[in-house]
């Protein structure tokens, strides 16, 4: 309850809730669309996922899809924290962008922070770099297949994508490629 105490110490006895950013993204989607049955995915430092069910409730489920396998290739990237391969966090986060950059021919400064490395790829994207676009297209392909997998668990009607990875032109490319793959591979 460290966060609740910090708020009370600073602002007094006001209502406060500490929530997962994935749950907040799903709730934001439900509120902005005026709809329910929404999967919210925040792609930033990690992949955060939340779900608002068909009745408009945050389920309270443990939606840690960051550690759900989305790539079964034995050569898939390994997550340093869990040791598992092919985890969503390696595809739908700033780390996903950073790990794909060298494969697309982009050299990033080794001494830069992860946020600075993401910004460098975003800057390349804004300047029209084909290599940076390839990074975001790849993420869009993985996202499409992962959404089909996630759908099997949640049966969502809407998806809201947020976070630094989805900002700017790169996010547009992710969404475009994701829609294309969904239409081709999962037309239903």
Could you describe each region identified by the protein language model?
Residues 8-16, 28-37, 54, 72-188:
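ATP-binding/phosphotransfer module of carbohydrate and carboxylate kinases, centering on a glycine-rich
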Residues 22, 45, 165:
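Active-site metal-binding loops of divalent metal-dependent hydrolases
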